[in-house]
Curated annotation (Swiss-Prot):
Domain notes: Three calcium ions are usually bound at the interface of each cadherin domain and rigidify the connections, imparting a strong curvature to the full-length ectodomain.
Function noted in UniProt: Cadherins are calcium-dependent cell adhesion proteins. They preferentially interact with themselves in a homophilic manner in connecting cells; cadherins may thus contribute to the sorting of heterogeneous cell types.
Source organism of this protein record: Rattus norvegicus (Rat)
Biological classification of the source: Eukaryota, Metazoa, Chordata, Craniata, Vertebrata
Extracellular face residues: 60-619
The protein's name in its UniProt record: Cadherin-20
InterPro entries, A to Z: Cadherin (IPR039808), Cadherin-like_dom (IPR002126), Cadherin-like_sf (IPR015919), Cadherin_CS (IPR020894), Cadherin_Y-type_LIR (IPR000233), Catenin-bd_sf (IPR027397)
Glycan-modified residues: N261, N420, N461, N542
Cytoplasmic side stretches: 641-801
Record GO terms (molecular function): beta-catenin binding; cadherin binding; calcium ion binding
Pfam families: CADH_Y-type_LIR, Cadherin
Amino acid sequence: MWTTGRMSNAKSWLGLGTSLYFWALMDLATTVLSSTPMPEVELDTLFSGKPQSHQRSRRSWVWNQFFVLEEYTGTDPLYVGKLHSDMDRGDGSIKYILSGEGAGIVFTIDDTTGDIHAIQRLDREERAQYTLRAQALDRRTGRPMEPESEFIIKIQDINDNEPKFLDGPYVATVPEMSPVGTSVIQVTATDADDPTYGNSARVVYSILQGQPYFSVDSKTGIIRTALMNMDREAKEYYEVIIQAKDMGGQLGGLAGTTTVNITLSDVNDNPPRFPQKHYQMSVLESAPVSSTVGRVFAKDLDEGINAEMKYTIVDGDGADAFDINTDPNFQVGIITVKKPLSFESKKSYTLKVEGSNPHVEMRFLNLGPFQDTTTVHIIVEDVDEPPVFEPRFYFVEVPEDVTIGTTIQIISAKDPDMTNNSIRYSIDRGSDPGRFFYVDITTGALMTARPLDREEFSWHNITVLAMEMNNPSQVGSVAATIKVLDVNDNAPEFPRFYEAFICENAKAGQLIQTVSAVDQDDPHNGQHFYYSLAPEAANNPNFTVRDNQDNTARILTRRSGFRQQEQSVFYLPILIADSGQPVLSSTGTLTIQVCSCSDDGHVMSCSPEAYMLPVSLSRGALIAILACVFVLLVLVLLILSMRRHRKQPYIIDDDENIHENIVRYDDEGGGEEDTEAFDIAAMWNPREAQAGAAPKTRQDMLPEIESLSRYVPQTCAVSSTVHSYVLAKLYEADMDLWAPPFDSLQTYMFEGDGSVAGSLSSLQSATSDSEQSFDFLTDWGPRFRKLAELYGASEGPSPLW
């Protein structure tokens, strides 16, 4: 069994046989677990510090709990308690074992004596209790001597944690002018100590900084205003420091602090005031409408919506000439021009401007009035203005037959300035590119300069300029619209070419065409045209004209029996007259074709040439024509054939063509890939060769006639005629001013190294080609293909080298 008393008392109380005893020793500062059993009591009663009654009351006994204080700072292990078995005779045969939470790490046990110690610093805030198991074993056999029993070690709290503000620092806002006691914000501090044990976690609040403006409730932590009429304009920001102290605020308690930043929000408690009671401004008389004259500003100590302003002109002689608007960003009043100004008409204006708050709080009306006024004096400054036309626009009507130089309008302008300078008039030629008009430079008389034609231009829009004589930069302008009135100067005419068709079987009185006319003149009351046959066709026996009295006319036949063979086309002149003054007329021609038609009146053919030949040809004439055509064709073919079979120029055989080339070898055995042929004709006529042929890349050097003999093959020495000829040509080339400045001479002093062919001198060892076979040249590869063809394939005489 587990107990905390002496063995005799434990046996008498519990009536048990063999048992295991618990001994516990507590620190002297706490309740001592004496040799008598400890009754189970509440912790706040056991450690509250209140006087305990000396009367003994009967309670239930708890034997399986130990108590130890946290934060032990001694150097020796902290003694917790003692385990003892009644089977332990003190000879060390019993071994005590401790297991469970913290066994061997936090708590240790002396396996011989059963003493339990704490070897680590304990913190109740980290762990409030530990549950362990104890067992007594036979040291020699390891057999359990007692059943395993469980017990608890509780950590008793001490005041080792100060209150903390987990949400600090705090930010709060309260309106200015708030009444005393207005709640601002609530702060909360927490204490990690055991709230059920003593006053370690009992927190009270106090204010360390921020008085006399604010106060704090000691229990709830609510911060309130403590001073009335706090003005934001005087002081806007406050820093309040709040302290939270445990142990109920008693001396020795731990404390924590936090900062509360409080801002006074604005209310509309300040009326606007103009810093100036009089403003003076100036504006040019030429300032356009809506241009800015100046600004006024009413100062308001409030901010935001409470500082919004509204400016109005409440009085003065300039209310109709000027306007004022409020700038929403800067809350200033902007005075602008409302209508055009004139220095000559009025030189100054006076305005009375009011600035007011549109948002007023009723509880602060006693601080008003919330508007203010100021006086603005505006002076109009004179400028040199351009001439002004009266009227501002001209509309002129003129007939198109007006004579050149006729005055159609007097344009008038004047200088609005007091100096009244002289004016010169002109026309903006960009508005009158045809130069139909001109204006008198001094009088402003607008006159015609060219004949007018309404049918060409019925409207003219010109711009007349007026310039001051003393200041040509001052130019005024006015628009003049000129309408050209119509006169009857155009005769009516057909709008298009009329062509009518009449059938051969047409009857008399049949309608063959309806015609109309157009007139370019402008009709005032509607044009009316009259149609009739022209005088030269008044007695036309074939056709007649009937006026429809609606500006159209019908063309009718007078007879029947029209025949294409007799006359296929008729031309009918028609006279068209208008109703203008004077009467104008013109003659239009109607073309009428006679056509073959079907019985139902559909036109079949209007071309008489389709039915007969204009000239009868005999069969003999046709045969003669065909014969001439055949002869011409044969001649053409003969000429073409002769041109194609023209004798071709003589082409020199390829084998003989080798005599026309000089072959240059950079090394022996190079074959045709190392050759560069030169046209022999260029040697005979170097001027033409230079003009016609593209220049060739060559290796230039000064001509050395005297050294030529050392490079000439031996065969050349035998033929002295050829040698002399070459020297003569070389000298001629050197002396020719048109020849290239250098001749290309190559030196062949060494035979090529590594050539599969031996010396070429073997080619000259025989007296004739028949004495030696040159078939081996074909085995030397493509580089010697040309040489193999020269010596192996040719059957003619050997070339002369």
